[in-house]
Structure formats: C-alpha cells, structure tokens
C-alpha cells in the first residue's frame, strides 16, 4: 500500500510561516474557548502515523529535529551533516527520494520551511495539507506559498477550531 506525503504547519492569517526574524513565538491561540469544534487535533496521534520527517536546513539548525528523536529525519541540504542516528542529508533529488519512500508505503511529514516544501507543491506531490491558521497578522515574514504555482484543487476533509486557531485538513480530489 502506498504511503502519503503530508504538509503540516502553522501559518499566520496573512500567510507567513515565520516572522521576519525567523521566529515562531507568535504561534499560539488567543486563549478564548467560546468557539471550539467537537473534534480535537492531536499532534501526538498524527505523529504515530508518520515514518519520515522532512525539514529544511534552517529548521535543523534551530534544533527542530530534536522533537522527532523516534523518527527518521531528512534534512534538505547539500552540506554534510554531523554523523547522527536517524538524520539523512537529502540534496537536489529530495522530491524523487521522498516519492520513492512514499511508494514503499511510508508516510512522510513535510515539516518546513517554505523553500523546502515549494518543489513538492509545484510538482503536486502533496497528498494532504494540514494548515493551522493562527489568529495573528504578521505583515511580513516567510510565506508558505512562494508563488508561481499552478491550480491544485483540494477537498476539505476536516476543520478543527479552538482558542482562535483553525486547523484545516485538505486532501487531493
């Protein structure tokens, strides 16, 4: 059975995945509980289904790979990485390597950032988009979508909301 490639990340209301300094401190809810969906998002449950995490070099340099110590992690970089169990440097052929893993039945989590995931979007390789919309307008930063994309039609599979955060889960038609 074929696996899936899943993009899962937070985005400001105006489309940024980090602020202009590369920070993520703005990723939190508004603290209100008036509106909440019956279902809840569980990142832990999501991760149980994931076999491989793919992230960019900046995410790696910020230590984000450390939260996935029980997963295989691929870093999108052409530079060598320190010898470490579970880390793999993936360069120019990242998309085709990830597609090979998907065809082996592995579920892949595209963690970020924008430059790393852009080729997957442009080649329409993402099976599932899970986007958490954070109730903040940053005004500037690094955008999720880098532009020059063609139309990709998706189907809304789930919508979860709590504390002002809306998590949208889209799948391919």
Task: Set out the residue ranges of the language-model regions.
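Enzymes that bind and transform nitrogen-containing heteroaromatic metabolites
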Residues: 1-173
């Amino acid at each position: 059975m074929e696996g899936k490639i899943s993009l899962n990340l937070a985005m400001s209301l105006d489309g940024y995945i980090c602020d202009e300094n590369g920070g993520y401190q703005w990723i939190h809810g508004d603290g209100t509980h008036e509106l909440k969906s019956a279902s809840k998002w569980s990142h832990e449950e999501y991760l149980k289904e994931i076999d491989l995490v793919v992230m960019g070099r900046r995410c790696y340099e910020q230590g984000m790979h450390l939260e996935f110590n029980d997963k295989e992690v691929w870093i999108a970089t052409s530079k060598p990485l320190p010898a470490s169990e579970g880390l793999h440097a993936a360069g120019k052929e990242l998309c085709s390597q990830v597609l090979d893993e998907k065809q082996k039945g592995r579920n892949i989590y595209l963690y970020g950032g924008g430059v790393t995931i852009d080729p997957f979007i442009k080649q329409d390789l993402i099976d599932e988009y899970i986007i958490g919309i954070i109730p903040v307008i940053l005004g500037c930063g690094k955008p999720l979508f880098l532009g020059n994309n063609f139309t990709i039609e998706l189907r809304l599979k789930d919508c979860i909301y709590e504390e002002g955060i809306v998590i949208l889960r889209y799948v391919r038609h």
